[in-house]
């Protein structure tokens, strides 16, 4: 009998200010990978994390 897939999925968090801000320390967009439980957190995830391109803590949103 086949085992069911788990509820945990791998997601990517992308800096929201790197996409819009031109005045930053270095070019590029910062991305983090993490996991989330699909059953408990159905909405898109938003976390404040450090962005080395902006050189400060910014909001990182979940992307597809």
UniProtKB/Swiss-Prot annotation:
Q: Which InterPro entries match?
A: Ribosomal_bL33, Ribosomal_bL33_CS, Ribosomal_bL33_sf, Ribosomal_zn-bd
Q: Tell me the domain of life.
A: Bacteria
Record keyword Ribonucleoprotein present: yes
Q: Does the keyword Ribosomal protein feature in the UniProt annotation?
A: yes
Cite a single GO BP annotation.
translation
User: What Gene Ontology terms describe where this protein resides (cellular component)?
Assistant: cytoplasm; ribonucleoprotein complex; ribosome
Picking any one GO molecular function of the record gives: structural constituent of ribosome
Keyword annotations of the record: Ribonucleoprotein, Ribosomal protein
Under the heading Gene3D superfamilies, the entry gives: Ribosomal protein L33
What NCBIfam families does the record point to? Answer: PRK00504.1, PRK00595.1, rpmG_bact
The entry assigns this protein to a family as follows:
Belongs to the bacterial ribosomal protein bL33 family.
Q: Which PANTHER family match?
A: 50S RIBOSOMAL PROTEIN L33, CHLOROPLASTIC, LARGE RIBOSOMAL SUBUNIT PROTEIN BL33C
Protein's UniProt name: Large ribosomal subunit protein bL33
User: Which species is this UniProt entry from?
Assistant: Synechococcus sp. (strain JA-2-3B'a(2-13))
